[in-house]
Amino acid sequence: MKLLFLILMSLVILGCEQPVNQIKESNLHKHIKILASDDFEGRGPGSQGGEKTKQYLKTEFQKMGLPSIKGDYYLEVPLSKMTVDLDSSFLSITKNDKPRILKAGSESVYWTKRVVEGVSVRSSELVFVGHGIVAPEYGWNDYKNLDVKGKTAVMLINDPGFWTEDPKLFNGKSMTYYGRWTYKFEEAARQGAEAVLIIHDTAPAAYPWQVVETSWSGKQIDLKRADMGKSRIKVEAWITSEVAEDLFKEANLDLKALKQKALKADFQSVEMSGLTLDAALINKVAFSISHNVAAVKSGYKKPNEYILMMAHWDHLGIKEDESGDNIYNGAVDNASGTAGLLELANYFSKVESERSLLVLTDIPL
């Protein structure tokens, strides 16, 4: 449904008269079948499967007659790859000198985007910060009156609009960027927190714990940054809702009641009394180069104005520490989106438009 909406909206935006039925379902199926096949090894950036994917995209753009932006279709993306050695690492919550080591995978997932061989956190106090959002345009600041430096921010996924369904509150049921896990880690880093625990909940996250466990286990990829990730949170983590319930009970807090309070702009952060986080993460660090793949079609009237259409081409690749079928093919995430983008690009390659069209298949970092 989302893909169909994207296709129809793209037709409206560009003001084309050609019939929608030129978008061929058979082509979508063909691209998905190829990109999600075992031959493409899960399309991990920097892997053989990733290289094969990039070549496939380039070839398809060439078949359409869409030129590259400059010289080549590849736009270089330098990558850092960090893999936590779970045998040598731990994450624990302590109450009254009694540590609870959270099981990696079944109770928590944790990693660091700092490009170092190891990070550690000692006796970091836990504080519940609602949704962990600072959004001046909505009159919202979950960190108000709080110095979170050196502390561990515990927060909910998504934003308050999801629960209230009030279209005037953020974007109602539809998630804004403030609701995404990426934003939450970024904002906590700006606030000076040392670690973050995001509480998983299937409905607002839009995926079950199994997806969290799979996505954040093993190798984590980030853009190779000038500061080597020093501006990032030391420890980024998710915990299950069951673990969260236990922790709030340990702190004599009612999580359900606090969730309701966190739906209002006057919410005030709450110290999780007596709870501290300790962690030691041992990292294996590697670097590689991958690419976004892009093509462009010039507009006839306003060539310096661009309509951007994009989809990420990558997925999880191969989980080398797993036995059996360890290829994460990613048919839905995101061979389907990439296929839709290719079919849109093919359609518009034969259509004259006032503005230029930039087609970008990227690695979302």
Show the residue positions of the predicted features.
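Sec-dependent N-terminal signal peptides
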Residues: L4-V12
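Second-shell loop/turn segments in exported
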Residues: Q18-Q22, D38-Q48, P78, S89, ...
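Noncatalytic luminal/extracellular "stalk/propeptide" segments of secretory-pathway proteins
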Residues: E41-P167, E271-S273, L281, S290
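Soluble metallo-hydrolase cores and metallopeptidase-like ectodomains found primarily
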Residues: T94-N96, S108-N145, D227-G330, N346-K350, ...
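A conserved hydrophobic secondary-structure block that centers on an alpha-helix together
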Residues: H131-E213, N304
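Acidic/histidine-rich catalytic neighborhood of metal-dependent amide-processing enzymes
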Residues: K173, Y177-G179, P204, G317, ...
